[in-house]
Amino acid sequence: MAIQQPEQFYGTGRRKSAVARVFLRPGEGKIIVNGKEFQTYFRGLLRAVHALQAFRETGTAGRYDAVITVNGGGPTGQADAIKLGIARALLKVNPDFRAQMKPKGLLTRDPREVERKKYGLKKARRAPQFSKR
């Protein structure tokens, strides 16, 4: 008896305050983000095209349908969260994809977060104007 492959693969991606939950199913390459078509959700955002980079690097573009739920953050953070989520889900499809994705940085979670505002300052680092006299 052959081992049954799961029909759905899951990956989570995070960037800044955005969290993306990605579900991949074998299909014809349809990508749905929060119930909308990918192009409609990210209309005109050039950075969003990079979210699909993992599909291009592994040669799986058009082979999987993706259902993505993303919340928090802005468009750029959400696009990068989706990018990481797709890459992690593709690793579950085939662990050999790691060799193609790792050198491109697709499996690295970007650790940069917003620095907190400190008391006595106007912003995180911006100090009030200084006057000698």
From Swiss-Prot:
Source organism phylogeny: Bacteria, Thermotogati, Deinococcota, Deinococci, Deinococcales
GO terms assigned for molecular function: RNA binding; structural constituent of ribosome
Keyword annotations: Ribonucleoprotein, Ribosomal protein
Gene name linked to the record: rpsI
Protein name as catalogued: Small ribosomal subunit protein uS9
Composition bias, Basic residues: 119-133
Region annotated Disordered, chain positions: 102-133
Compositional bias ranges of the Basic and acidic residues kind: 107-118
GO cellular component: cytosolic small ribosomal subunit
InterPro entries: Ribosomal_Su5_D2-typ_SF, Ribosomal_uS9, Ribosomal_uS9_bac/plastid, Ribosomal_uS9_CS, Ribsml_uS5_D2-typ_fold_subgr
GO BP annotations, alphabetical order: translation
PANTHER family (UniProt xref): RIBOSOMAL PROTEIN S9, SMALL RIBOSOMAL SUBUNIT PROTEIN US9M
Family: Belongs to the universal ribosomal protein uS9 family.
